[in-house]
Design a protein with these regions (language model features):
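Bacterial N-terminal signal peptides that target proteins for export
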Residues: 1-11
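Short helix/turn-capping signatures at newly exposed starts of structured segments
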Residues: 2, 16-132, 198-202
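Residue-level detector of intrinsically disordered, flexible termini
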Residues: 10, 18, 26, 163, ...
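Non-cytosolic coordination micro-motifs
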Residues: 105-202
Length: 202
């Protein structure tokens, strides 16, 4: 995969819009679980299957607070991949990948690294999700009231179908705009319904 080597993330985020050279037109968000796992496992990745391990790793994740609003067909899978592509033993340094599938299709992915994610790795992660489009950096001038958002975002794809957000220095989240909006609207409706009872008696 060719990437403009003269660009660094520091340079890129200084512009409102930026694009990447891509060789694949299929994005990860929107892919089936079968496709994602085939690619991941062929690169040495493995899946956490023990329920206690999965529960421990999903606790406190951004998507966890919206669990009550998950569609019935939702599955959460957690994977581990080494940085050098060697066979994962589900421990040690490397990456954790959290994927929220709805009807067997990826709608949210969190990439969590045991060390800080480098600017070059972040470029690749965004590049993987470009789908022949390009990414725009979030602007403070954008009104958050324009559309409900559960997670907010640091980047949005030009077709507005996918958003991305940095989660500290070692994690990065990518998710569909539809899922983000759906969680936000469900939460707002729930809060609205609870408000009368909450203030009753004042």
């Amino acid at each position: 995969m060719n990437i403009k080597k003269t660009f660094t993330l520091t340079t890129l985020i200084g512009f409102y819009c930026f694009s990447f050279l891509v060789t694949k037109t299929s994005a990860r968000i929107g892919e089936s679980r079968t496709t994602i796992q085939k690619r991941l496992f062929s690169s040495g990745g493995a899946e956490f299957r023990e329920e206690s391990s999965v529960n421990n790793k999903t606790r406190g994740m951004p998507y966890a607070k919206y669990e009550e609003f998950f569609p019935k067909s939702t599955e959460i899978r957690v994977y581990h991949k080494t940085t050098d592509g060697s066979h994962s033993k589900l421990s040690g340094s490397g990456w954790e990948l959290h994927v929220l599938y709805v009807n067997g299709v990826s709608e949210l992915e969190i990439y969590k690294k045991s060390q800080k994610i480098t600017e070059f790795e972040m470029i690749y992660l965004l590049n993987f999700q470009s789908s022949a489009s390009y990414w725009k950096k979030s602007q403070e001038s954008e009104s958050p009231a324009e559309e409900p958002s559960a997670f907010g975002f640091d980047f949005i794809r030009d077709d507005e179908k996918v958003k991305a957000k940095k989660l500290g220095g070692n994690s990065f989240m990518v998710y569909s705009t539809e899922l983000d909006r759906g969680f936000a609207e469900a939460m707002l409706a729930d809060l609205k319904a609870l408000a009368p009872q909450s203030v009753e008696g004042f």
